[in-house]
Amino acid sequence: MGIGLVRPAPEEEIQAMVEEISASNIEAIITKLVSFGTRHTLSQQNSSTYGIGAARDWIAAEMRRYAGDSEGRMSVVVQSYVQPVASRIPFPVRISNVVATVRGSEEPERVYVMTGHYDSRVTDVMDYTSDAPGANDDASGTAIAMELARILAKRRPRSTIILAAVAGEEQGLYGAGYLAGTLKNSSTNVEGMLNCDIVGSSTGDRGQRDPFTIRAFAQGPPSYESATVAARRLQIGGENDSPARELARFSAEVAANNVTGMNVAIIYRLDRFLRGGDHTPFLTAGYPAIRYTEPNENFDHQHQDLRTENGTVYGDLIEFVDFKYTARVGKVNLATLWSLSEAPGMPRNVTIDTTVLDNDTRLKWIVSNSTAVASYEVVWRSTTASLWTKMLDVGKVGEVTLPLSKDNMIFGVRSVGINSKKSPAVYPFPG
């Protein structure tokens, strides 16, 4: 039943875009960000050469320069608010996100977000005067957001893509929280969020190298689900099929290939131990979100005062960044974002019939009235498999019965466009 799932070969359009990503541009952006001395959220904001204010203004100017090639499709705003005294915020401070929006040409109401944070820190999270280059954490992610903005400014995505450099991450995810809250309060349909944080090095603290892998951290059962829904998810074995994990599977399917030169290693966790990231506020807001992070971290080069002790160099210095690796991570992000944007939206109200004891699987969903949707595809895998292994195109219908036991498989349904692009799968709940 069905056929083996085959990862789609990247089309010429995606190949052309990812080839535009320049390691030299990545290096130039990171070098400039490091030159501001510190980008600590609490650092000064009235200088043109030093502190987070200088970094903010330079990022915004560059983004606006890119927008000049967009024929009006890209807009750039500096989204700011004053954060009152709070955890890691000893005095009121203005937190600013630089947000570039490439408006979709056909479905502008469907939105995808990619972020990197441009603030930095040293050992003491409250030290806002010492130099904090933050070359890897997270000038690397910011550089990817900016490089993608440069490239996408010249394209016409079907859906809207937001590329943001956010602040306040090191103090408590404040900038990303404000961005996610703003989108949520305006009822924006964000169908996917990618967070790039610490994506600049291919070498770990023991010298281990893996220059062709990026980790994708994906949360299990969503924290926003009610107790009733969470209990039902566990009852039916859906703990590994959260929207975040479907997004991670999608990224692995479309962006782990010879064009990007990368493997996407899905990690079934919200984040690393003792760490957090800007995807979390988006998850809390109910949006599918994942975090990309390099495979082997060197903690001597994160959150450290600049110093040398016993021959060991500490600090997040630019000399430890692998620009070619960072560019490849950018290719993964671009391939994922573009594939999401060009595919139809995810199917709605996907359910599985569990009212009778039998060995069939009956699935239902709402048929989209969009002419961009050509059909729907059912995908499935064994309960112990990480990725989808089988697929069956069932046409543009709203239900299907398969002679496969729902007890033995995990099922999903995804939309297929007239352009053959496929959405992330949606896991069915009983209904």
Curated annotation (Swiss-Prot):
Binding site residues for Zn(2+) 2: 137, 170
CDD domains: M28_like
UniProt feature coiled coil, ranges: none
Positions of the Fibronectin type-III domain: 344-431
Pfam families linked: Peptidase_M28
GO cellular component entries: extracellular region
Single GO MF annotation: metalloexopeptidase activity
GO biological process per UniProt: proteolysis
Subcellular locations according to the entry: Secreted
Glycan-carrying positions: 46, 185, 258, 310, 349, 359, 369
EC number, UniProt record: 3.4.-.-
Keywords, sorted A to Z: Glycoprotein, Hydrolase, Metal-binding, Metalloprotease, Protease, Secreted, Signal, Zinc
SUPFAM superfamilies for this protein: Zn-dependent exopeptidases (SSF53187)
Requisite cofactors: Zn(2+)
Cofactor note: Binds 2 Zn(2+) ions per subunit.
Binding-site residues for Zn(2+) 1, renumbered to this chain: 117, 137, 197
Keyword Protein biosynthesis among record annotations: no
Family membership noted in the UniProt record: Belongs to the peptidase M28 family. M28B subfamily.
Protein name: Probable zinc metalloprotease Lema_P086240
